[in-house]
């Protein structure tokens, strides 16, 4: 089959493994497959982390390249979760979303004030450069950028998936700006050059 489906996707099998741990780190979308964990599953993981007093750190740096439905960022913005989510930390990055890798501009979101205080104490006194700040502010001015980028990526991702499939490869269900695929033999390089 050309569609390798869930492959390495996150499942409920992770829930019992949370017990006894202080921190769970997840990438959503998954790296390297680009698959997005369903909101229902992420909510269950968050609830289990709450029960187990385990911090949940979710790297959503590539989420802006997906259709973004049901992300923990969306949940975080919901005032209903505020008192229940002191153990949730979400990482985001301008450097990925706005193609500014050399400028190192990212941020975290959490309601855990104690953790934020510790991060400020441990961080450098000058953690964002002036050029990075200026680029971040400029990036936020283009309100249609993310919509246009998602639309472009949706078409180009499918074109790439179709091409790999035509060459005999199998692709995992990526929703991100990258794909993960399996190819049956070692001739892919030559076929891509042809």
Indicate residue ranges for each PLM-predicted region.
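Active-site pre-lysine segment of PLP-dependent enzymes
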Residues: 7-20, 32-56, 60-97
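Structural motif
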Residues: 23-27, 57, 107-109
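A short, flexible beta-alpha/helix-coil linker loop
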Residues: 29-32, 142
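Alpha-helical scaffolding segments of alpha/beta enzyme cores, especially the outer helices
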Residues: 40, 44-47, 80, 114, ...
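Conserved C-terminal alpha-helix-loop-beta "cap" of PLP-dependent enzymes
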Residues: 165-170, 178-194
């Amino acid at each position: 089959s050309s569609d390798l489906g869930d492959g390495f996707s996150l499942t409920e099998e992770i829930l019992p493994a949370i017990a006894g741990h202080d921190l769970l780190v997840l990438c959503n979308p998954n790296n390297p497959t680009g698959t997005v964990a369903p909101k229902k599953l992420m909510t269950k993981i968050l609830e289990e982390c709450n029960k187990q007093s385990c911090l949940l750190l979710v790297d959503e740096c590539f989420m802006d390249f997906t259709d973004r439905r049901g992300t923990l960022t969306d949940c975080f913005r919901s005032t209903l979760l505020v008192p229940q989510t002191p153990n949730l930390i979400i990482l985001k990055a301008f450097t990925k979303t706005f193609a500014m890798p050399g400028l190192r501009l990212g941020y975290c979101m959490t309601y855990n004030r104690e953790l934020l205080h510790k991060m400020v104490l441990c961080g450098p006194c000058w953690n964002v450069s002036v050029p990075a700040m200026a680029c971040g502010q400029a990036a936020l001015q283009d309100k249609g950028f993310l919509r246009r980028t998602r639309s472009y990526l949706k078409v180009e991702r499918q074109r790439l998936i179709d091409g790999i499939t035509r060459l005999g490869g199998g692709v995992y269900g990526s929703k991100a700006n990258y794909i993960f695929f399996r190819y049956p033999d070692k001739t892919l390089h030559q076929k891509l050059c042809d």
